[in-house]
């Protein structure tokens, strides 16, 4: 219930993450990959074990304050630093976890959609109750019966309108919002796997950039400008 109520508030944003959030994410991945490439995975150990105290991650506040995303990335960096640098193994595991995240994030949309599916039935029940009440007044003149039957049918109309004109679209918006939430984790995965496959740090984040939808995808020039302004990573 708390998760669903949180989604109602989040719908005002349109999407879970903006273009600026993704520029920051890609910049952070670039710093991580550059540090790992120049100083080795052991240099990442202090950042992996204490991400909330990491000076590296503190440079990227949106990511740093995202507990779930921080844990997601650091868990895989830890596995890699322990010696498992097989991209196929890491990708398979990341896919499994992302699928779990997707299922979790889809719960609010499914809950509201289930409610939307049941609302027309409530309208029908209201209509039937109205007809039953009308039948008890069958001896009344037609103009009275017409009003009573019309009142009964309002229940059906209201149920259909609420289901397909209000609650259903809200459920759809929640499902779309959940997809934007999951996209953040998939972008992390694409960057990490590209780096494990031997790509240079800048090429790895370019893979992640190209994966993003156009409405939040920074241009090559926007990202390059940001990367060029970053300080050199330190252990």
What is each model feature region?
Residues 1-108, 180-235:
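Large intracellular
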Residues 93, 97-176:
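Helix-termination/interfacial motifs at the ends of transmembrane alpha-helices
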